[in-house]
């Protein structure tokens, strides 16, 4: 049975995409799929934490939200919860926790926390309950991220056994997860007649827009496989991080 991905590849290259065979790649596909599920779960929990902080203490969310997946932030939330628990713990205890997990930014993180706490003088309804919920969410997120790390180690071990792994991981911005996904989707590339066919299929070859009266130049193609679009964004963020 042809999947939409297979149909798209045939349309782009004129060559059918053959299924990747082998026990190793079959196991790799299971691990990569599970890692994708864990990534979605981690995003969901992160958004839940940030949403809860926003509802009870917006300033604290601005201080912790962008760094919510950092081990120091998760440990602080896990032990002391929300605004009331953080203030009760005190600066010294939070600094001890933060510097253990983030030696360089620990003190600055605690300063940001207490600066945020001081900007809000009212207690919003639900703050007490948040002190109970936030540690549980932080623990769940820590466990999910740890599972992703463990799965990534297994993926890397399997990927190292493939002859194309060195080529893939040598490309700027491509790590273990992205390399594994590319390998699963395009195989060894033998299904594509030329590199240009593969580039067209992946949506990275420029397309010239022509009409009956003009040529508008070359632009990125509007269509490409969803997996490739997601990976391109991930690579770009890794290679050109936000300043």
For the regions a protein language model found, what residue spans apply to each?
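A detector of single, family-specific signature residues
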Residues: 1-243
